[in-house]
Amino acid sequence: PLEQCLSEASQAGFIGIESGGKFPKKSEELIPKLNEFNLHLCSGWYGANLRTNSVDEEKNIIQDQLKLFKNCNSPCMVFAEVSGSIQGDPNRKLSTRPQMDLEESKKYYEKISEMGKYLEDEGMPLAYHHHMGTIIETEEDTVRLLENTHESVKLTLDTGHMLFAQGNSLKFIKEFSERLIHMHCKDCLLY
């Protein structure tokens, strides 16, 4: 239950928490619930379909979450591309994840740059989440994204996903610190 999640986060000493599926979607319900446990909304997942949607379509789709996050004074939005993703599908091998050719990559970087600028103008920085089973999974994918997008496209560094993809989280902390605005610190067992 939501109350147990919030209570345990607060008891563990956290002051912020990301939104999840159990969280109210309206700020007038969410803010009092967070206040009850002395927590703030530090971000939350937005699953984008920018590969298949136009930027204008994605801007329209993101509005409810953008409004919620702004009302809750969230510092950023964790943004991940989910179109074609294999995450959560136990019948698909990791090797079948979606990948982009050079032409699609260029178009995607332009679109994600436009979304980054839009969200920055809205006061809600886009914190791109590299993720297993998606188009931006590996260290190389993530470096290309950062090197080919506008500086408004920031990074959520997820240490578990980076390790699972055989990447180096320290590299991003050292080389891309100006783009790093959110982190997911995780352990990952590799067998």
Name the predicted role of every residue range.
Residues 29-33, 141, 168-175:
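A short acidic, amphipathic alpha-helical/loop segment
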Residues 168-191:
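Aromatic-lined glycan-binding groove of carbohydrate-active enzymes
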Residues 7, 67, 144-146, 171-174:
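Short, flexible, glycine/charge-rich loop motifs used to bind or transfer phosphoryl groups or to couple energy/partner
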Residues 1-4, 156-157, 162-166:
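Short, compositionally biased strand/turn segments
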Residues 20-22, 46-51, 82-84, 131-133, ...:
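Active-site beta-loop-alpha junctions enriched in small/polar residues
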Residues 1-75, 110, 114, 120-124, ...:
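N-terminal pre-domain/capping segments
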Residues 56-157, 164:
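Active-site acidic/histidine proton-transfer and metal-coordination neighborhood
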